[in-house]
């Protein structure tokens, strides 16, 4: 049965969707996706994202923008971007969060001392902007959970948000939850070998969890062998993820947890609304 869902993290503004974005959204609506949170990742795309999310879509889905400087795109960021971000947050109350922001030690070039110092500086500056405007954050963290938590405490951000694509331990998940953050789980959870993530999915209270696709990245296991147009994936090819495949994540949770699928869907929707303070109408939208 199709159930109303919110994709709490989808880069629908990415160039990978330029050729068929409207079709992707139509397919998402058909799958039950009533809302999509779109976190920007570089300043050059902020204006276009705001315009895209403001466009009326009578058939859905509702699209909510978040603005931020993603750590993986460190080389693209300018110091003046922080001034622009502050200005846009002041002028655009429809922005639901500061994100995608965070820290990344997975890529070797980002772990170099100078790059790491710049990551931390930009991250904490954006946390400060979020704190000043009492906005939630959408966080990226790879191999740096202790540092992320330390920055949150140092800056004093307590306005909640989502740690997206969570890949840490149960204990780390509980630390984020204690700080008022929700944990976003998506495609990686659906893969059979994801034992650690599945432990997180079953150990945390349902109230701490949200679901996401992170499209075009992190494709779910059921859709990993062929492209959206039905072509089989060839060796070395990457399958573009889609918000229409968000039900794969719901189905995995339903197989792992005792709650009925309908209860899970409603909880994930309500948790996303609460985490990002989305308009209450998000709770009653029909797919």
Tell me what each language-model feature is.
Residues 1-287:
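Mid-domain alpha/beta scaffold segments of enzyme catalytic cores
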């Amino acid at each position: 049965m199709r159930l109303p869902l919110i994709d709490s993290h989808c880069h629908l503004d990415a160039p990978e969707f330029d050729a068929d974005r409207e079709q992707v959204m139509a397919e998402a609506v058909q799958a039950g996706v009533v809302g999509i949170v779109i976190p920007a990742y570089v300043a050059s795309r902020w204006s276009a994202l705001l315009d895209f999310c403001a466009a009326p879509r009578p058939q859905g889905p509702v699209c909510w923008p978040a603005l931020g400087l993603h750590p993986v795109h460190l080389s693209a960021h300018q110091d003046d971007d922080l001034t622009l971000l502050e200005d846009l947050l002041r002028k655009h109350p429809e922005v639901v969060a500061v994100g995608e922001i965070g820290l990344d030690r997975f890529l070797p070039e980002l772990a170099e001392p100078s790059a790491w110092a710049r990551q931390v500086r930009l991250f904490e500056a954006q946390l400060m902007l979020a704190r000043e405007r009492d906005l939630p954050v959408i966080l990226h963290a790879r191999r740096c959970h202790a540092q992320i938590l330390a920055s949150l405490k140092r800056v004093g951000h307590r306005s909640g948000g989502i740690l997206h694509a969570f890949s840490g331990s149960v204990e780390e998940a509980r630390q984020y939850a204690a700080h008022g953050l929700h944990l976003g789980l998506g495609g990686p959870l659906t893969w059979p070998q994801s034992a650690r993530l599945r432990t997180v999915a079953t150990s945390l209270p349902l109230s701490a969890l949200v679901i996401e696709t992170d499209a075009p990245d992190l494709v779910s296991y059921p859709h990993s062998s062929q492209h959206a147009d039905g072509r089989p994936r060839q060796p070395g090819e990457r399958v573009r993820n889609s918000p229409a495949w968000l039900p794969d994540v719901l189905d995995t949770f339903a197989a792992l947890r005792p709650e009925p699928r309908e209860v899970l869907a409603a909880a994930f929707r309500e948790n996303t609304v609460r985490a990002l303070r989305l308009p209450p109408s998000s709770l009653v939208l029909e797919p």
